[in-house]
Amino acid sequence: MKIADGVYVHFIPTQKYKTNRIVFRMTGSLNKQTIAKRALVSQMLATANQMYPTVQSFKERLASLYGTQLSTRVSTKGLTHSVDIELTYLKDALIPTNEGLFWEVLGFLKECLYKPLSRVAQYQNKVFDIEKQNLMTYLDVDTENNYYYSEVKGRELYFVNEGLKVPKYGQAELVEAETSFTAYQEFQSMLTRDRIDIFMVGEFDDYQVLQALHRFPLEGRQIDLQFSYSQPYVNVVKEKIEPRQSSQSILQLGYQFPYQYGDKDYFALIVFNAMFGEFAHSVLFTTLREKEGLAYSISSQFDIFTGLLEVYAGIEKSNRNQAMRGISRELNYIKLGRFSSSLLNQTKKIIRMNALLSEDHALTLVEQRFNKVIFGDKSLSLENWLDEIEKVTKKDVCRVARQVKLQSLFFLEGVS
């Protein structure tokens, strides 16, 4: 439902949970220059505001609302970057008063958005500096993790788009360059220029919600967003080797595929990836790790919104070429149809089970609705989605596998 140009509210009625959930999402274009600013905004939104200017008073106010929880997160989809504020609170039936919490919770959200902890067009320095340091520490700790580091470096190598080279929370050097002024100005831009989607998950009075949201100064905005990205195939594989002090080496491979969300072969791609390396029954795991002992860990994953499929393997440095040949061999076997019907059927069962389990999470419902709004008929109901998975044949999997092509190879070489 449109509130203004570029501003929408989405009702997701459900009695599945004891809580109601409000998700306020701001989505802008993915840009290397703004990722760190937006990550800092998400930190500040979950820390304090003018009405509750300390971390302690902020938490106490949430506690007074019968333990209402506030969290923020950032995410990317194609060439877009989103910042979410999520408020979760008890439904009226569980509150020992007749008034309920809706108005107070939405009022608190409004304070976070329109009364941020600021002075003279910038965030209050003391709290901002703490949150900036917290984010930098978080990023530094992540970078010390060899698997995370290899993933980041693998994507830097694979992508040509500068925004996609940067993790969704930014990089420490990008965060370091931001100030209380630059982050605050970005926040003001987000409020007035980003696409805004407000998700109401649970039991809500639609009229009451619309009445409340019209009190927010949400003006119309025009924004052109690209939720899908497709990188052209090149016939030269980019390679990089980087030594790092570690007892283990990591092989990070980037493959390109030509499919987008909702395409006919999207479902075959899901099945292929699950069979190739996503789960513990996959050919990479059972063959390279369990049977041949070439990898401590190995897995694959793909992002339908950027056209990237990744394989990582934690290995001994001396096993690099052997592991590379093993991964290529297993991919070729799938291309040639050298896998059993029982493996295909087992894969479908696991995908089905995981999809049904994910329905228990409110965020899954939010993403399903968002995809429906963005992609229209390409986004299917769970029932239809499962039907499409079930229709995938061996021939479909082989066809998709033949379109998965290696584009980058990053090797984190462990040295003592």
Regions found by a protein language model. Give the residues of each.
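Short, polar/flexible loop-turn hinges at active-site or ligand-entry regions and domain interfaces
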Residues: 48-51, 93-96, 115-124
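Short, low-order "capping/linker" segments at domain edges
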Residues: 137-141, 238-250, 352-362
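Short amphipathic beta-strand starts and helix->beta connectors
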Residues: 66-71, 174-186, 237, 291-298, ...
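Short, flexible, solvent-exposed loop/turn segments with mixed acidic/basic and small polar residues
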Residues: 75-76, 84, 183-191, 299-303, ...
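Compact, aliphatic and Gly/Pro-tolerant "microcore" segments centered on a short helix or tight beta-hairpin
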Residues: 124-189
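M16 family metallopeptidases and their MPP-like homologs
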Residues: 18-30, 36-38, 55-111, 148-170, ...
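His/Glu-rich zincin catalytic helix
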Residues: 1-66, 171-174, 184-287, 324, ...
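Acidic/histidine-enriched alpha-helical segments
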Residues: 59, 115-139, 227-233, 333-358
